[in-house]
Regions:
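Extracytosolic/lumenal membrane-interface segments
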Residues: 1-320
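Fungal low-complexity intrinsically disordered segments enriched in serine/threonine and acidic residues
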Residues: 314-333
Length: 333
């Protein structure tokens, strides 16, 4: 799967094009609606820059035959220590550092989006987000430092013999396990943050389902972090048997995929006009089953109509206002 240079380049370019389109549409939508740019927007641009860097690295690695090709030896085999493998290790270290930073920027962008949408109306959520944003920032910083210092003061041991690597870099694999586990946990928590808020909105059921589905696009990011974790764990267990370059290629490719998929997922809530048209038939079906009781009998015509674009919370401002109104009504009751 990973010894296909043309496929790796094509996949990298396609993901970059899709993320570029998503970020471009996000900004053009804001300019068209004359909305302000917030921290969440600039953070996603920073993540896109890191994603672009990872794409260039992937293509460069394939071009110099350090990624996407077989070397014929396992990563801990003394015969595998060649210039080709060392170049791949340099690329892999850059992938690790840029990948963690890019993923962290995506998470922070999503958290700041929640802040601008919901924090004003929800005091408890505001307090939680302050803590959560701090933890996410510390998560990224700590694992970037862990990547830089995985061999302590013997950084060159990463590119040395297996004996040197095992002697000086013993914490690298446990640190990697901790990173992929906490990455998944952070993605999952970030994904479910808006669910109680959206369920509490005083809007039509179909609108509520549609809004929820748009936020749950973030499940793509959770799925990619699970996949990357699986690839990392499987690769670390196969260091004695699997081809060295294939292991590094697989890890680098899923590092890139997680960042790019995260950017796409983070742009989802701000591309509601496009996604509304895509999800409307599905939400109509779900809502009709959800409310197939007395409400259907009393309002048959209402349930037969698809939600129009003007009826939906189609912008950040509308959704923030809807959240504020719902919280005010709940407080009044």
């Amino acid at each position: 799967m990973y010894d296909n240079p043309q496929g790796l380049i094509a996949g990298s370019v396609i993901m970059w094009v899709v993320t570029t389109l998503c970020v471009g549409m996000r900004f053009s939508q804001k300019l068209r609606d004359r909305q302000r740019f917030f921290a969440s927007d600039w953070l996603i641009v920073a993540a896109w820059i890191f994603g672009t860097g990872l794409t260039i690295l992937e293509i460069y690695g394939v071009a110099i035959k350090s990624l996407g090709y077989k070397i014929g030896a396992a990563i801990l085999d003394p015969t595998a220590i060649t210039g080709q493998l060392n170049k791949a290790k340099h690329i892999q270290l850059a992938f690790l550092l840029l990948g963690i930073a890019g993923i962290d920027l995506v998470k922070l962008s999503v958290c700041f989006l929640y802040w601008q949408l919901f924090a004003k109306a929800h005091t408890k959520l505001r307090r939680f987000l302050i803590v959560w944003i701090t933890l996410i920032a510390l998560w990224g910083t700590s694992f970037v430092l862990a990547g830089l210092l995985e061999c302590g003061s013997h950084l060159t041991a990463v590119f040395g013999t297996p004996t040197e690597y095992l002697k000086h870099c013993g914490s690298a694999v446990p640190s990697g396990y901790a990173m992929v586990a906490t990455d998944f946990a952070a993605d999952f928590v970030t994904l479910i943050i808006p669910i109680p808020v959206v369920l509490g909105l005083h809007i039509d059921t179909r609108k509520k389902i549609l809004t929820l589905l748009i936020f749950l696009i973030g499940a793509l990011s959770v799925a990619s972090s699970i996949t990357k974790g699986y690839i990392y764990i499987r690769s670390s267990m196969g260091m004695y048997t699997e081809d060295a370059l294939i292991i590094l290629t697989g890890i680098s490719m899923w590092n890139l995929a997680e960042v790019q998929i995260g950017i796409i997922a983070a742009c989802g809530p701000l591309l509601r006009p496009v996604l509304i048209r895509a999800f409307s038939p599905l939400t109509t079906l779900i809502a009709s089953k959800w409310r197939s009781s007395s409400q259907v009998a009393r309002h048959p015509k209402e349930n037969q109509e698809l939600p129009s674009h003007s009826d939906m919370p189609g912008s950040e401002v509308d959704l923030a206002k809807q959240s504020t109104l719902s919280e005010a009504k709940a407080g009044a009751q």
